[in-house]
């Protein structure tokens, strides 16, 4: 009888097990850690500020929240995965019997740290860790998995050190600032990155409040044939005669007063003569780079109208694997990356697909693929580039081929990624521009003919691309010295717009541009400022700071200007990269930071004065102390000034409501549960109900109920 060796493959997500298993032989067993297995203690710093040695703890299972119904508790327990202790016990038991242990956690620094934690725990439990091998793959395909197993490596200790340094820095700043701000202004948290995001939102709000619009006028002509003319140059004699003092000539002329524009209008005749037709110029429009995490987030927010957390969730599903024709298949590569790089081998596969599907004329040139803009070069200096851009694993699996085999959300996001990837390897679109120049009493105008000569990548990307501003004129209609009559001469008023509030897409763009945050943290950053009531979404889209957010941003900016700023965060990311490369010592860096930070922290404890707003004539019914206004996570409230000795809170007039969660449906914007609500105005439902997002008022998604629909209630609890 032949003894077969046994092997263990350790991954993070249990959702990957079925997808990976089909590429392995029967002697492999897959064990999922379900994310991190150890972390710093939840309620203490977790290390001293002398040697910074972390005190790791096994992550404890979360307890059900207070007020959750017995039914919901039972369902929670029934659906719960194994706790971390059970996972570790199972892993240790299997590892002791295994001949080889492959640590296949995610291919980034956090994944490297999880592998190290597994390695360290196994070592503590007496497992022979010489059996451990670190492997990585950026996509779950047969080729990638088998290639990774064939090329194992050691755990990158410097990567682990960099990740643990980030964790300790965030703990230092988060714990110390959060404790201070909680005691002074009742703000729940003040993390390093979330505070920068809040600073961006607050500064933008200040610019909006200070904004003073500037007005200007343009003189626009519409000929009887519908051709639109733009004023390009005013007769010099007329300009001198009328005494224009402020004129700005760009592509056209802007008048600073309506009176100036009116004076020029009065000196125009009805006839506009063509005096020149320019030689046609060709202009190319190139496809954008393949997606990285930030650009996928921005595009899906803008084009699919999704929230950031939903994008992260659906992308993870496509990466871990979906069931298609009874087979588990991963559709995209690792979705957390700051790289736009793809391998030449993969690129050739896509180029061949383009040639076969659309024709050789649609294949991108090599010079086009090798080209880099100045912006790209500047941005790449901030990129870790640990793995490739987000792309379909098999480009031949078209969106249409899986449309009816995966969920509508999965299809929408896969189509977005697939289209962007294929478009990148397609030829540029080519436009032809011709300027037709007119003259009227020595005042010069022009019209533009802008037509698409070759669609190139727009053949597949038009649905997602910004609309082309094409102006198609019949060039045969125009000839030198031919005159045209005006239908209308319009004086149009314009005004500058205030800076736009951040959306989730533009906030991600701003954070990335400044080198703040990582691909794995964008959605969390955007979500936490809403959850903490530091900002709200206006019209479900635009970030606006709340009163609490403004107070927090003000105190942080006033007392921690050297910490809560983009330069510190950028420099910190650079140092973390250097630690990952082994050129900077982590403890020395942490010690230097703590020496400076602790000094500023002590000053802030003295400088920040806790403001209390007493309510005249109102006393606590329990202890007779005066009532005060306070700011909480869910907004302002009235409570006892003798807190925490007395915990009286004045109840609002709103009565407790029963929350009924709808079975089997989620919010299309943020993926939260939907709740049955009662409309104020009568609709066609007899009981006047509709579905609304449980994340209201942060998310205002609603969905109507059919009159005859009687859905099963999932959960019911009183709040």
From Swiss-Prot:
InterPro entries: Topo_IA (IPR000380), Topo_IA_2 (IPR003601), Topo_IA_AS (IPR023406), Topo_IA_cen (IPR013497), Topo_IA_cen_sub1 (IPR013824), Topo_IA_cen_sub2 (IPR013825), Topo_IA_cen_sub3 (IPR013826), Topo_IA_core_domain (IPR023405). This is DNA topoisomerase 1. It comes from Mycoplasmoides gallisepticum (strain R(low / passage 15 / clone 2)) (Mycoplasma gallisepticum). GO terms for biological process: DNA topological change. Monomer. PROSITE patterns: TOPO_IA_1, TOPO_IA_2, TOPRIM. The active site is at 334 (o-(5'-phospho-dna)-tyrosine intermediate). GO terms for cellular component: chromosome. It catalyses: ATP-independent breakage of single-stranded DNA, followed by passage and rejoining.
């Amino acid at each position: 009888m032949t003894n077969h060796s046994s092997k263990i493959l350790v991954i993070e997500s249990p959702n990957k097990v079925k997808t990976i298993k089909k590429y392995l032989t029967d002697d492999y067993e897959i064990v999922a850690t379900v994310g991190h297995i150890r972390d710093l203690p939840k309620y203490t710093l977790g290390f001293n500020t002398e040697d910074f040695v972390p005190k790791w703890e096994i992550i404890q299972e979360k307890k059900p929240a207070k007020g959750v119904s017995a039914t919901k508790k039972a369902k929670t327990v029934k659906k719960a995965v194994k706790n971390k202790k059970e996972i570790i016990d199972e892993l240790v038991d299997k590892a002791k019997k295994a001949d080889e242990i492959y640590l296949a956690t995610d291919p980034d620094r956090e994944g490297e740290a999880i592998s190290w934690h597994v390695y360290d725990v196994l070592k503590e439990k007496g497992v022979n860790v010489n059996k451990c091998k670190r492997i990585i793959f950026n996509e779950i395909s047969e080729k990638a998995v088998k290639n990774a197993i064939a090329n194992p490596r050691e755990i990158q200790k410097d990567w682990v050190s960099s990740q643990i340094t980030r964790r300790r820095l965030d703990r230092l700043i988060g714990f110390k600032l959060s404790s201070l701000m909680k005691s002074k202004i009742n703000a729940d948290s003040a993390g390093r990155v979330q505070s920068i995001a809040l600073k961006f939102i607050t500064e933008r709000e200040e610019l909006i409040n200070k904004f003073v619009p500037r007005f200007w006028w343009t003189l626009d002509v519409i000929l009887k044939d519908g051709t639109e003319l733009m004023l390009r140059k005013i007769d010099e004699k007329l300009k001198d005669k009328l005494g224009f003092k402020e004129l700005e000539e760009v592509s056209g002329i802007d008048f600073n007063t309506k009176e100036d524009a009116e004076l020029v209008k009065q000196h125009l005749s009805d006839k506009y003569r063509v005096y020149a037709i320019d030689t046609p110029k060709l202009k190319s429009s190139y496809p954008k780079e393949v997606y990285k995490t930030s650009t996928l987030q921005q595009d899906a927010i803008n084009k699919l109208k999704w929230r950031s957390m939903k994008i992260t969730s659906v992308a993870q599903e496509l990466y871990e694997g979906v069931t298609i024709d009874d087979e588990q298949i991963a559709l995209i590569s690792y979705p957390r990356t700051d790289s736009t790089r793809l391998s030449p081998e993969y690129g050739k596969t896509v180029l061949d697909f383009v040639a076969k599907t659309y024709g050789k004329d649609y294949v991108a040139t090599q010079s086009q693929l090798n080209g880099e803009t100045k912006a790209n070069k500047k941005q790449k200096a901030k990129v870790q580039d640990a793995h490739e851009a987000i792309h379909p694993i098999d480009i031949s699996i078209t969106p249409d081929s899986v449309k009816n085999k995966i969920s509508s959300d999965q299809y929408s996001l896969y189509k977005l990624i697939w289209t962007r990837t294929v478009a990148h390897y397609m030829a540029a679109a080519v436009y032809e521009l011709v300027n037709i120049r007119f003259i009227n009493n020595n005042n010069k105008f022009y019209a533009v003919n802008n037509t698409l000569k070759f669609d190139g990548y727009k053949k597949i990307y038009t649905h997602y691309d910004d609309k082309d501003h094409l102006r198609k004129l019949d060039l045969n209609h125009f000839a030198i010295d031919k005159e045209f009559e005006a239908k209308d001469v319009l004086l149009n008023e314009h005004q500058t717009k205030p800076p736009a509030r951040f959306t989730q897409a533009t906030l991600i763009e701003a954070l990335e541009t400044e080198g703040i945050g990582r691909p794995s943290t964008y959605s969390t950053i955007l979500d936490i400022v809403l959850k903490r009531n530091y900002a709200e979404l206006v019209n479900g889209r635009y970030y606006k700071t709340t009163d609490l957010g403004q107070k927090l941003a003000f105190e942080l900016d006033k007392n921690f200007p050297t910490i809560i700023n983009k330069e510190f965060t950028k420099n910190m990311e650079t140092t973390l990269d250097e630690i990952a490369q082994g050129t900077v010592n982590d403890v020395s860096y942490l010690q230097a930071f703590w020496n400076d930070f602790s000094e500023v922290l002590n000053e802030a404890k003295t400088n920040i004065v806790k403001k209390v707003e007493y309510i005249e004539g109102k006393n606590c019914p329990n202890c007779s102390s005066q009532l005060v206004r306070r700011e909480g996570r869910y907004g302002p409230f009235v409570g006892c000034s003798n807190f925490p000795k007395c915990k009286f809170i004045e109840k609002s007039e709103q009565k407790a409501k029963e929350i009924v969660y709808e079975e089997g449906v989620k919010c299309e914007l943020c993926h939260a549960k939907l709740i049955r609500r009662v409309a104020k105005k009568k609709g066609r439902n007899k009981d006047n109900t509709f579905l609304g997002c449980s994340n209201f008022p942060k998310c205002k998604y609603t969905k109507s109920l059919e009159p005859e629909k009687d859905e099963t209630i999932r959960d019911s609890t009183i709040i």
